[in-house]
């Protein structure tokens, strides 16, 4: 079987896709004669979806050099009043024996050159060491978030109080290399509540990043603030010990698959042909990720702001969440679009706007000549897709580490305009604020400057993956460390 690189994905489609993209990049550079890729993944998580096996079959068929090994089903230890992340982290730990047996079995017929794990799979780090396999982390975030996560154990050490970050409304924290401080309430969602077991899990994960052989990051050097890269390289983020090598190998983005011929395929094709008829850089695209969702009251404010702005738009609307305070929905359940939007909105904006339900082919949309701006939840994959397409953003974070991303996009990278959210109202944004930010991006001189900057970054993104690009060079350095 020769040399193999083993990747271990956290539960959930997004994590598996990211590992696949990394595997593809390695093999496309070196060829399957140099390395094969084996991806380990779990079975039975509460975040599993029916789309995962479909995706894996497709990748196995189109990329035979990538093999998948699914672990036996493990039952979630669901306890009342425990958060979904805490349940998931416990579930991952229960899979440790399967990690050990998989590495043992693979090692019988191949040389495992590297074991690359997701941050949430940190309990597998000592297992890799047990087999004397160089073990690396793969971070699907920017360098600024990596800097923050490396430094988080230090902040935990300095703030040994009984208060949670979510309650420290007047407190801000500084991270090495960041231009501006971060509100305590805007910390990564996993650490907001000190009483949630996910808090101590996250501190444990972050404290183990420096104990790996290195960290591979889905970003590219030219995108990142030099002060952040210097802070990481100079050891400022891990003041009490050495920082491992960091390899920036992005932007790694999933290739847009063909539009599925489902019941909604015609609508998706309609939105692409509609975009083709619009003037250059005139359309604002609004999409909040695969799970981002708003209650009906917020949807109405967005609609009012879009209508008042007078701008062209393509807006992906998801079904409002069942729980009013939630900002996530799973799946693409059908719903009555007219019922969640202001009466007559669709008719009044029909000449300059289009609303689609649940999903649009985002990578394809962002690359359309007519798209001139992107309202995003600041998920890192979406950010990279916009950067590659050269499209400036309006940053509207919802959950996870998205508030941290917003800070960096607006202040450090200067590629986005931030919306003003009412933290005391769950991040609510008024229709007037929507109109103001839309006009700022699409009409103002500041928006034009942002657009020019993003266009140049798009060219740099392409160059980074080229033969002499920074990300290719960093991949070569990573491979040199394992061969």
Curated annotation (Swiss-Prot):
UDP-alpha-D-glucose binds at residues 140, 360, 362, 377, 380-382, 385, 401-402. Keywords: Glycosyltransferase, Transferase. It comes from the Eukaryota. The active site is at 15 (proton acceptor), 118 (charge relay). GO terms for molecular function: UDP-glucosyltransferase activity. The keyword Glycosyltransferase applies. InterPro entries: UDP-glycosyltransf_plant (IPR050481), UDP_glucos_trans (IPR002213), UDP_glycos_trans_CS (IPR035595). An anthocyanidin binds at residues 15, 400. It catalyses: phloretin + UDP-alpha-D-glucose = phlorizin + UDP + H(+). Pfam families: UDPGT. Its EC number is 2.4.1.357. It is an enzyme of class 2 (transferase). CDD domains: GT1_Gtf-like. Belongs to the UDP-glycosyltransferase family. Glycosyltransferase that possesses phloretin 2'-O-glycosyltransferase activity. Converts phloretin to phlorizin (phloretin 2'-O-glucoside), a potent antioxidant. Is specific for phloretin and does not possess glycosyltransferase activity toward caffeic acid, catechin, chlorogenic acid, 2-coumaric acid, 3-coumaric acid, 4-coumaric acid, cyanidin, 3,4-dihydroxyhydrocinnamic acid, epicatechin, 3-hydroxybenzoic acid, naringenin, 3,4-dihydroxybenzoic acid, quercetin and rutin. Can glycosylate phloretin in the presence of UDP-glucose, UDP-xylose and UDP-galactose. PANTHER family: GLYCOSYLTRANSFERASE (PTHR48048:SF20). This is Phloretin 2'-O-glucosyltransferase. It comes from Malus domestica (Apple).
